[in-house]
A protein has these predicted regions:
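Juxtamembrane regions of bacterial inner-membrane/periplasmic proteins
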Residues: 1-170
Length: 170
């Protein structure tokens, strides 16, 4: 552990700039529209309207928590039980079948880090998740996560996913 502390300090020093949480890092979407304004087709990723926590349907919130981080409201960015469960499941399977990252860790990675699987990135993800947990309420973390997470079919955010999959806003 004595060697781990300087390494964590070095990784903390090398963190990305996190001063502007609200910064928009989204890529452009190209929309082809008819003369009457109807969208004919879209190219690239789709981003929906930003929804505040109270605007997001409770069943969406509960579903994401149930799937991604059952103890979200009980931890401070790291879920040791969830991490241990994932390690055991992966060892039994002999491959990666389950992740142990919390919603806060996933948000830290999605907002600030690359998807590379390195020890450095994992330490930075953990440090950033602690920072998010100190800076934001659980509801704010969920709102940012649900507005920025990838839901498939090129849809980023719960509103874009709802529009893409169901044809209406969340």
């Amino acid at each position: 552990t004595i060697l781990l502390v300087p390494l964590v300090v070095y990784y903390a020093y090398d963190l990305p700039d996190i001063s502007n949480l609200e910064q928009n890092n989204t890529k452009s979407t190209i929309m082809v529209m008819a003369q009457n304004g109807d969208v004919i087709s879209t190219y690239g990723n789709v981003y929906g309207e930003w929804l505040d926590y109270q605007e997001i349907p409770i069943n969406h919130i509960e579903a994401v928590i149930a799937i991604e981080d059952k103890r979200f409201f009980d931890h401070s960015g790291l879920d040791l039980r969830g991490l241990a469960r994932a390690i055991v499941s992966n060892l039994i399977a002999g491959r990666m079948v389950e992740g142990g990252s919390t919603i806060s860790q996933q948000l830290a990675k999605n907002l600030y880090l690359s998807a590379e699987r390195t020890f450095k990135r994992k330490v930075q993800e953990l440090l950033l998740s602690f920072w998010l947990e100190m800076k934001l309420s659980k509801q704010e973390i969920l709102a940012v996560y649900l507005n920025r997470a990838y839901f498939g079919s090129g849809a980023y955010g719960i509103d874009a996913a709802s529009r893409t999959i169901f044809g209406h806003s969340a």
